[in-house]
Amino acid sequence: MSDMHSLLIAAILGVVEGLTEFLPVSSTGHMIIVGHLLGFEGDTAKTFEVVIQLGSILAVVVMFWRRLFGLIGIHFGRPLQHEGESKGRLTLIHILLGMIPAVVLGLLFHDTIKSLFNPINVMYALVVGGLLLIAAECLKPKEPRAPGLDDMTYRQAFMIGCFQCLALWPGFSRSGATISGGMLMGVSRYAASEFSFLLAVPMMMGATALDLYKSWGFLTTGDISMFAVGFITAFVVALIAIKTFLQLIKRISFIPFAIYRFIVAAAVYVVFF
């Protein structure tokens, strides 16, 4: 594989990762399709995916850095407020409660979860996750009990964490599971999305660090330029995607995302079966 070809693949996969990681459409489903079509699979590809996820995580940190520092009691001037936010009552306890269920299950069943990573399971997860998005839109309270992040209760945070366990099923989508769970628990669509992004930082950093540690042996100096291009591309695209997504959900429901998931599931079937 030539250097230019490798860099092109890195850029393409960086765009795919950045666009899909925080949208409720399953980055996993997209990555396995695109990776397969590009012929980029195997241990190096898996390590590459882990590295570019760090770029997506960094985009959330940049986007919500004031809020993240505020969670640990560090404030810089007047806190930035996003739509639906109030006086800064969201605490680190909310984040911890949202993390606990998936962390416990993830550690207990790590090997089993990894064994589920195959096209057929991803295809089913795409469909079930799409149905959950539709259910969340249809069954959510007419008036959210938590219109903003700072209106969320500890119980709501914990229940969102329970829904996040669904994302241990490869292809389900972590953001899809948490946002749907939040809406069903009475959190507004916008606030549930923001909480999902904040929750992603410790969850994804922990999971990515573990995967990177286990994949370290597959890294070579020859891969540095390719990994750097993928990382930077994923960061820039994720930053744009997050901003656009938060504006978009003010105007539309998640039904279009659910339909899109069904289309991706069909694409997985066509490509792999």
Swiss-Prot record:
Keywords: Antibiotic resistance, Cell inner membrane, Cell membrane, Cell shape, Cell wall biogenesis/degradation, Hydrolase, Membrane, Peptidoglycan synthesis, Transmembrane, Transmembrane helix
GO CC, alphabetical: plasma membrane
Coarse class of the protein's main subcellular location: membrane
Entries under Pfam families matching the protein: BacA
InterPro entries according to UniProt: UppP (IPR003824)
Keyword set includes Transport: no
EC numbers: 3.6.1.27
Subcellular location: Cell inner membrane
One of the GO biological process terms: regulation of cell shape
Bilayer-spanning residue ranges: 6-26, 45-65, 90-110, 116-136, 190-210, 222-242, 252-272
Reaction catalysis annotation: di-trans,octa-cis-undecaprenyl diphosphate + H2O = di-trans,octa-cis-undecaprenyl phosphate + phosphate + H(+)
Gene Ontology molecular function terms on file: undecaprenyl-diphosphatase activity
Tree of life domain: Bacteria
Membrane-protein topology: Multi-pass membrane protein
Family membership noted in the UniProt record: Belongs to the UppP family.
HAMAP family: Undec_diphosphatase (MF_01006)
Function: Catalyzes the dephosphorylation of undecaprenyl diphosphate (UPP). Confers resistance to bacitracin.
Note: Bacitracin is thought to be involved in the inhibition of peptidoglycan synthesis by sequestering undecaprenyl diphosphate, thereby reducing the pool of lipid carrier available.
Protein name per UniProt: Undecaprenyl-diphosphatase
Species annotation: Shigella sonnei (strain Ss046)
Lineage of source species: Bacteria, Pseudomonadati, Pseudomonadota, Gammaproteobacteria, Enterobacterales
Gene: uppP
